[in-house]
Amino acid sequence: MSSAPPTPPWNVRRLPRADGSVVLVTGGNAGIGYFVAEQLAATGATVVLGSRNPAKAENAMASIRARVPGAQVRAVRLDVADLASLRTVADALGVERLDAVVHNAGVALDDPPRQETGDGHELMFGTNHLGHFALTHWLMPLLSAAPAARVITMGSFAAKSERLDLDDLQSRRDYRPKRTYGRSKLAQMHFGLEFDRRLRAAGSTVASVVVHPGGALDSLTPSRPGVHTKTAAARLGAAPAALLLQGKHAGAWPAVRAVLDPAVRGGQLWGPRAFGLRGEPHREPVWANLADTTVAARLWDASRDLTGVDPAAHLG
């Protein structure tokens, strides 16, 4: 009796084909999201850039097409900071099914004062977490129509040292930009893991995976005309950082693997291999601050109340 050939090791430079698949990348016009889109486009997948800025989306698509002959890439207007606008995204996609969504769009503020979305939510929590929570709700019919869709949540290494304050999710009492950012990304990661628990309990074919890019710097990122320009000064200044960190092209690798690799399972956490900061994508143990399912369930309930929608409402 012959045995199946061993699965070859994952190679970020020789990705499997994904012809016929449709993937939405929020914030796909810049940064890590751009490189997620570029790398997925090279597999033959149809990649949709979710962007609030049409001009930047056009530049990103032009860059991808220049590097990937025959790339199937287009854009939809998408602003995760505007909850009401997300209702129309599924229709705007113009597809019968969605094989994956990469929840990548986000905002990080370095300095006070505290800012809010048009819906009255703290800007980072509202954009990074609540927007993607609500978007998932509206995308669920398309995701459920695919044979084995994946929801990929882009977390952050900045979340690893944080704890959620469930009584101050909007940072009204304690607003420190870096802490608030880390907590917003932690909320996102809790969502991704809790969503998978609910998907599994309902017997859904959709899986939810959490990833993070490690330490991904602009100064270590290759140039893409119209999207990102790397100067000689930036290259020189970034040399010491390259020992521990990486560019945003490499920060995209965990998300790309989570979309494409059949060995990746829902409820897993993936990040860079070397200390969680750089290198090839690999599976990590779920962080200790993500292990409390009671916290995750309470966050889910709060998110449902704040957005008025529930991504798991129609499961089962």
Feature map (PLM): residue ranges:
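C-terminal amphipathic/interface module of NAD(P)-dependent oxidoreductases
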Residues: 287-316
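Rossmann-fold NAD(P)H-dependent dehydrogenase/reductase core
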Residues: 2-226, 308-314
